[in-house]
Amino acid sequence: MDSNTVSSFQDILMRMSKMQLGSSSEDLNGMITQFESLKLYRDSLGEAVMRMGDLHSLQSRNGKWREQLSQKFEEIRWLIEEVRHRLKITENSFEQITFMQALQLLLEVEQEIRTFSFQLI
């Protein structure tokens, strides 16, 4: 994974964990969990591509990897919509910047996962 992407994930997760959004803190914790899960999935998919020939072990380890891939894209779309919603309702500039960066990162990661998945197909 690109070192900028790693630091972006870490930076956004750290910023989000410091936010206090009142009654919606439970939703924010859910977003943080989704971000962490997405990062791990993206890393494992990237490692499989790096090993090239690892498609068969990926398929045998998880026969439903295409289903899992589809689920991850649904999670990304959900996160994108959630981040856009937060961006619309927040007036705090720190939160706006954080959510704008999170949105940009999600779009980049979505593209990377698409690229990896095409290489594995």
Curated annotation (Swiss-Prot):
Signal peptide: none annotated. Gene3D superfamilies: 1.10.287.230, S15/NS1, RNA-binding. A motif (Nuclear export signal) lies at residues 12-21, 85-94. It comes from the Viruses. GO terms for biological process: exit of virus from host cell nucleus through nuclear pore. Keywords: Host nucleus, Host-virus interaction, Transport, Virion. InterPro entries: Flu_NS2. The keyword Heme does not apply. One of its GO terms (cellular component) is virion component. It is found in: Virion; Host nucleus. Pfam families: Flu_NS2. Interacts with protein M1. May interact with host nucleoporin RAB/HRB and exportin XPO1/CRM1. Belongs to the influenza viruses NEP family. Average number present in a viral particle is estimated to be 130-200 molecules. Mediates the nuclear export of encapsidated genomic RNAs (ribonucleoproteins, RNPs). Acts as an adapter between viral RNPs complexes and the nuclear export machinery of the cell. Possesses no intrinsic RNA-binding activity, but includes a C-terminal M1-binding domain. This domain is believed to allow recognition of RNPs bound to the protein M1. This is Nuclear export protein. It comes from Influenza A virus (strain A/Fowl plague virus/Rostock/8/1934 H7N1).
